[in-house]
């Protein structure tokens, strides 16, 4: 008799995705981040669900309800900090996952890659709206500044901003709708992740060499299930260490002050994972130009497959491209640092140079270098 997992309509899907899936025999630790992102999403949905049971999305009580969760709810402080720092772990895994895709040419799977870019936008939107919910100073002013950027859109801008706010400023209506969206988006993200996997399993996984691995496949279980479990344990170790030893390390002290529309914080800045995009936004003196650069800094990922000029898929055997890739990583770290600094000399010029280099590397320097490497193959 055939095994039930191979015949049952539901178990058959799980079996073909996580058990009998033919996987390349040489995929490295960089391929662990997909499963880690799945774990992060589950952690966020579960902790978020328990937080939503005690949270109230009203400007008068939101801040107090978060305080109540931390002080009076059983292990409320743990749930709250797991959720807040879980977002940071989520973004660390996301950035490493995208970086892996860029390095090893995984973007050649167009549908998988484009859904991944869409997922990145969805996760960023969710995180932004979640940051508004505690209704601290940085929540309020972050929401005001970022939503105000839409006013740069010609003709419909100011109407659009008021429509999103549900009034003439960030207020009760804004908080309520942000909570509603913050609650529903993770489930949309989960559905998109399912589609992401569906398209990935159509073509099969890429591998470090960038060559076809059809001749050398191994079953996903037990080889990669055990490898993924190790990754998950390390992720949980990192997350719990952060939560139990320094839960406020990545947060902003201003967010422990109740939102006050009459008092602007000296430095308005988003969470650390948005700082690189925020630095690009600030480096352009024009409002509309800044907004376009902000959107393009992420949207540029969708263009990457069309800029692939190399005869090789992966960067594994392309030393010049490798060098440029790590320059790009250093550039993004520089932008992250600049995003957290005040708008003054020398940070302004460093931010502008780093922003120009970011776009130049992806759009011009890397494709040209790939062409040069193609010529090296002939020698």
UniProtKB/Swiss-Prot annotation:
Which parts of the sequence bind heme b b566? 97, 196
What InterPro entries does the entry give?
Cyt_b/b6_C (IPR005798), Cyt_b/b6_C_sf (IPR036150), Cyt_b/b6_N (IPR005797), Cytb/b6-like_sf (IPR027387), Cytochrome_b (IPR030689), Cytochrome_b_C_euk/bac (IPR048260), Cytochrome_b_N_euk/bac (IPR048259), Di-haem_cyt_TM (IPR016174)
Gene Ontology molecular-function annotations: metal ion binding; ubiquinol-cytochrome-c reductase activity
Gene Ontology biological process terms in this record: mitochondrial electron transport, ubiquinol to cytochrome c
Predominant location: mitochondrion
* Keyword terms: Electron transport, Heme, Iron, Membrane, Metal-binding, Mitochondrion, Mitochondrion inner membrane, Respiratory chain, Transmembrane, Transmembrane helix, Transport, Ubiquinone
Q: Which residues are noted in the entry as a ubiquinone-binding?
A: 201
Source taxon at top rank: Eukaryota
Q: Where in the cell is it found?
A: Mitochondrion inner membrane
Q: Which GO terms describe its cellular component?
A: mitochondrial inner membrane; respiratory chain complex III
Mark the transmembrane ranges: 33-53, 77-98, 113-133, 178-198, 226-246, 288-308, 320-340, 347-367
Membrane topology type: Multi-pass membrane protein
The record describes the protein's role as: Component of the ubiquinol-cytochrome c reductase complex (complex III or cytochrome b-c1 complex) that is part of the mitochondrial respiratory chain. The b-c1 complex mediates electron transfer from ubiquinol to cytochrome c. Contributes to the generation of a proton gradient across the mitochondrial membrane that is then used for ATP synthesis.
> Which family does the entry's similarity section mention?
Belongs to the cytochrome b family.
The protein, known as: Cytochrome b
Q: Which organism is it from?
A: Sorex tundrensis (Tundra shrew)
Q: Source organism lineage?
A: Eukaryota, Metazoa, Chordata, Craniata, Vertebrata
């Amino acid at each position: 008799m055939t095994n039930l997992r191979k015949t049952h309509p539901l178990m058959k899907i799980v079996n073909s995705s996580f058990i009998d899936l033919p996987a390349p025999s040489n995929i490295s630790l960089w391929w662990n981040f997909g499963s880690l992102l799945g774990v992060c999403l589950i952690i966020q949905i579960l902790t978020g669900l328990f937080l939503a049971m005690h949270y109230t999305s009203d400007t008068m009580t939101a801040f107090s309800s978060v305080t109540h969760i931390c002080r009076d709810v059983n292990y409320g402080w743990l749930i709250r900090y797991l959720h807040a720092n879980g977002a940071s772990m989520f973004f660390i895994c996301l950035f490493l996952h995208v970086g892996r895709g860029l390095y090893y040419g995984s973007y050649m799977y167009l549908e998988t890659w484009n859904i991944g870019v869409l997922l990145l936008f969805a996760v960023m939107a969710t995180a932004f709206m979640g940051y508004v919910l505690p209704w601290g100073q940085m929540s309020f002013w972050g929401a005001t500044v970022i939503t105000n950027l839409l006013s740069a859109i010609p003709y419909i801008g100011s109407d659009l901003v008021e429509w999103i706010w549900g009034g003439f400023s960030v207020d009760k209506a804004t908080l309520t709708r942000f909570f509603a969206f913050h609650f529903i988006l993770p489930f949309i993200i989960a559905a998109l992740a399912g589609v992401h996997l569906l398209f990935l399993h159509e073509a099969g996984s890429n591998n470090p060499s960038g060559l076809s691995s059809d001749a050398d496949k191994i079953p996903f279980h037990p080889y990669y299930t055990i490898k993924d479990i190790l990754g998950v344990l390390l992720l949980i170790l990192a997350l719990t260490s952060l939560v139990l030893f320094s839960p406020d390390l990545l947060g902003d002290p201003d967010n422990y002050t109740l939102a006050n529309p009459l008092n602007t914080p000296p430095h308005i800045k988003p969470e650390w994972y948005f700082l690189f995009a925020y630095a690009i936004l600030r480096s352009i003196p024009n409002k509309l130009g800044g907004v376009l650069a902000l959107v393009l800094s992420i949207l540029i990922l969708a263009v990457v497959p069309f800029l692939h000029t190399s005869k090789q898929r992966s960067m594994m055997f392309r030393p010049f491209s490798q060098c440029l890739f790590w320059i790009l990583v250093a550039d993004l770290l520089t932008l992250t640092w600049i995003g957290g600094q005040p708008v003054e000399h020398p940070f302004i010029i460093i931010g502008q140079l780093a922003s120009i280099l970011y776009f130049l590397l992806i759009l011009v320097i890397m494709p040209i270098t790939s062409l040069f490497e193609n010529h090296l193959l002939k020698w």
